[in-house]
């Protein structure tokens, strides 16, 4: 499976939905431009999934089962599907190739041979399943998640992979608030220092009128700061909650 999550600007929504409905080899009369979910299966068994979220969209391509050695390899027959996946509008927030094999022995061989960074590679068990990732972008611009099913039923395995992907996706969505937090940190520190200064001057008995004017100006600055950050910080809190929930489910 290959999955890409993108941030889409409002003016690109129509173009993006139109692109989503052009899944190669898939005829979906119900894939209307207003749909938030579009999916289909092309001849040869390649599955396509597209879903619109509040701020982002997730596009996924699920390839038919292939040799273990090829789970991260882009084959010639994959070109149309990968073209659909990579040509969509919007800024890429996260792009991951998920390789699924039957056993840990197969997965360990792949981890040695397919460019995982030995220094950064981590692995863990989730029930029967074991997963590996080095959390790096590789030469093709995708991260890699390697999964050994170890006998887990296909439906349960699908749910587990979905939760792992959602954990990573919502974590990255939460991090959209980091640049703003860093940018506004100085303003917050300045406001805190101003409050301390005014309090100290009040204790010394300075003129009430001047202090009142400064407090009014400070309140206005804080109100503007709150308004400028409210949406992004609220979204960050919501995405963090979802990521935490997915982690608890795992």
What spans do the regions from the language model cover?
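Alpha-helix initiation and N-capping motif
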Residues: 13-16, 157, 208, 240
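Membrane-associated alpha-helical segments
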Residues: 214-250
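N-terminal pre-transmembrane cytosolic regions of membrane proteins
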Residues: 1-97
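Extended alpha-helical interaction modules
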Residues: 51, 62-216
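Short small/polar-residue motifs
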Residues: 42-47, 128-134, 236
């Amino acid at each position: 499976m290959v999955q890409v999550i993108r941030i889409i600007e409002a003016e690109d929504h129509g173009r993006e939905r139109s692109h989503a409905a052009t899944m190669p080899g898939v005829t979906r009369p119900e894939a209307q431009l207003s749909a938030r979910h579009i999916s289909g299966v092309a001849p040869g068994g390649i599955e396509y999934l597209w879903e619109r979220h509040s701020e982002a969209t997730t596009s996924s391509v699920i390839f038919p089962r292939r040799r273990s050695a090829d789970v991260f390899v882009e084959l010639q027959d994959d070109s149309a599907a990968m073209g659909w996946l990579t040509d969509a509008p919007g800024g890429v927030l996260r792009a991951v190739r998920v390789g699924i094999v039957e056993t840990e022995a197969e997965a360990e061989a792949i981890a040695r041979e397919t460019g995982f960074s030995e220094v950064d590679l981590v692995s863990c068990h989730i029930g029967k399943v074991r997963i590996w990732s080095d959390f790096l972008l590789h030469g093709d611009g995708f991260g890699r998640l390697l999964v050994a099913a170890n006998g887990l039923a296909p439906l349960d395995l699908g749910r587990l992979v979905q939760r792992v992907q959602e954990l990573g996706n919502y974590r990255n969505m939460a991090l959209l608030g980091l640049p703003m937090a860093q940018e506004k940190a100085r303003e917050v520190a300045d406001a805190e220092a101003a409050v301390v200064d005014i309090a100290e001057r009040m204790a010394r008995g300075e003129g009430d009128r001047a202090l009142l004017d400064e407090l009014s100006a400070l309140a206005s600055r804080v109100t503007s700061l709150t308004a400028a950050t409210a949406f992004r910080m609220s979204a960050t809190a919501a995405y963090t909650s979802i990521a935490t929930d997915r982690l608890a489910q795992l």
